[in-house]
Amino acid sequence: MARWAQSLDPGLLEQAAQALRDRTQWNESGVRPSAQRREAENESENLLVNRRSMRSFLASPVPLDAHLEKILAIASQAPSVSNTQSWRVRTYCDPARQEELLALQDGHSGISPIPLLLLVTVDIRSFSGANERNQMWIDGGIFVQQLLLAIEATGWSSCPMNFSATNSQAARLRKIAGIPGYEEVVCFVAMGRADAHPPASSLRRGVEFLRGN
């Protein structure tokens, strides 16, 4: 165990220790240092800097007509391989229906009641050959990021929720949600109006952690 611990990246250990300190300092005392966010120099940067995963929503419903259509129209401008645009989005606002679906996701316990739940899938018929076997996840991930930014840009908040499930869980989700076999589930996205006093978020890693050389 000692040798294994010594092999870990010191930066990873420090990040874990910082997360524990954050939980004690911010979540229990309610202090949110403003210095943890980078200053934006223009409106575009402001959107990118201030988007956060929101886990606490107001109870107000999300209008499924004008707002959602606008969000999806913006999200659909995301790039994709050969411009295949293979994404699909399903929406759920009924709490009982949401609970049925999220019971298979098993990672939403820290999120307040969700005004609108989105389920993002990718049509794998758009890809062919072994060289494109992972392209669905790349295109799906790019689309989800564009979707999150579109939600933020239109005045709403969101939280992506992964679907790292077993084959049996995935099969049950397909059956419940009516997802055909040629679509792969990318993730869920919770959407709504942000609570004015959400739980404090953890620190972001510095740019030095991003550089690979």
PLM feature spans:
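Acidic, surface-exposed loops and disordered segments
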Residues: M1-N213
